[in-house]
Design a protein with these regions (language model features):
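N-terminal accessory/interface modules of nucleic-acid-binding and processing proteins
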Residues: 2-326
Length: 326
């Protein structure tokens, strides 16, 4: 199976305030020289943000930590992605990785986040001395090209959010731990996950001992459930293959042009691993796919392309949103 993804990025969850790392472009400049300088500064800052985020991902992987592993043991909430407490919007793309990593590093117990202004609007305040977490979004900047036509340029900006654990005077929601969830060593059919998978319309054949998506036939092959030691392993594997399944031209149309062992193949495997992690978190599955054999390839790509993780996480979020629409 060969993979060559399209490059795309998505806007992250809506926020009421931002602290941009890019310079403001509103207002008129006094001369063309100042405009050119402003553009250069914008580009430089955006480039730095890509590097800052990439460096965090590299450091985590080099320390044996996958930043896309949902921190179930911290939040006790394994059926949701990081979410803005005010808007109830899920964060997406690379922001999921940044916020999950922060939960693990700081030991936060809440999956909810707010900006400083949002906390104040809800009657709360950030506890003195607390440091926020910087996440990103894209803003479109319009300019005229050489033909005099409007051209839209995506500009990377950042803003700061705080975990609900860092905020006082806001009533925190009680997170109910579902005791009926199967443990890692138990196999139990999860009806809500089965229904979600059925709703995708994917053709899934249970036969043999390998799990794979066949693009030529547009079908998924899975071992029978009794071959898995736990339902978590089974559903995590199936979400992984379903993420591959979204490449089809009738769905998300990711281009497949490589073969096993190529950089493009490793990239698609990262997209599928991230997509499976997002779907597991959103559907209450504890499972995690182990693809450690690809880590060396991913690290090499991350060191050579600061936008690599942004592209993969964006495509994974698109797959997750396709498979589990809200």
């Amino acid at each position: 199976m060969t993979y060559s993804p399209t490059i795309n990025t998505t806007i992250t969850a809506q926020q009421t305030t931002t602290k941009g790392v890019a310079l403001r472009t509103q207002g008129s400049s006094k001369n063309e020289s100042s405009k050119r300088k402003s553009k250069k500064r914008v580009a430089k800052v955006a480039k730095d943000m890509y590097q800052i985020v990439t460096d965090r991902i590299i450091a985590a992987l080099e320390n044996g930590v996958k930043p896309w592993a949902c921190p179930w043991d911290r939040t006790q909430q394994c059926d949701m992605l990081p979410m803005n407490f005010k808007t109830k919007a899920q964060y997406s793309g690379v922001n999921i990785l940044l916020l999950w990593s922060e939960i693990v590093e700081k030991g936060y117990s809440s999956p909810y986040w707010l900006t400083y202004k949002q906390a104040a609007e809800l009657g709360g305040n950030v506890i003195k001395g607390q440091k926020g977490t910087e996440i990103i979004f894209y803003k479109t900047w319009e300019k005229k090209n050489e033909q005099g036509e409007d051209e839209k340029i995506p500009m990377l900006r950042s803003f700061v959010v705080f975990n609900l654990d860092q905020i006082e005077n806001i009533e925190k929601p009680v997170i109910a731990v579902k005791e009926d969830r199967p443990k890692n060593d138990e196999f139990e059919i999860l009806p809500h996950v089965e229904n979600a998978i059925l709703a995708t319309g994917a053709v899934i054949n249970h036969v043999g001992v390998r799990a794979f998506y066949a693009p030529s036939q547009d079908t998924i092959t899975m071992p029978t459930q009794d071959r898995f030691t736990s339902s978590s392993d089974y559903y995590a594997t199936l979400w992984h293959e379903l993420t591959h399944w979204t490449v089809h031209k009738s769905r998300l149309d990711r281009k497949l042009t490589g073969s096993f062992g190529t950089k493009d193949y490793a990239f698609e495997e990262l997209v599928a691993e991230l997509g499976a992690a997002f779907c597991c978190a959103d559907s209450g599955v504890f499972g995690e796919i182990q693809h450690d054999s690809y880590i060396a390839s991913w690290l090499n790509a991350l060191n050579n392309d600061k936008k690599y993780i942004f592209k993969a996480a964006s495509l994974a979020s698109k797959a997750h949103q396709y498979l589990l629409p809200r």
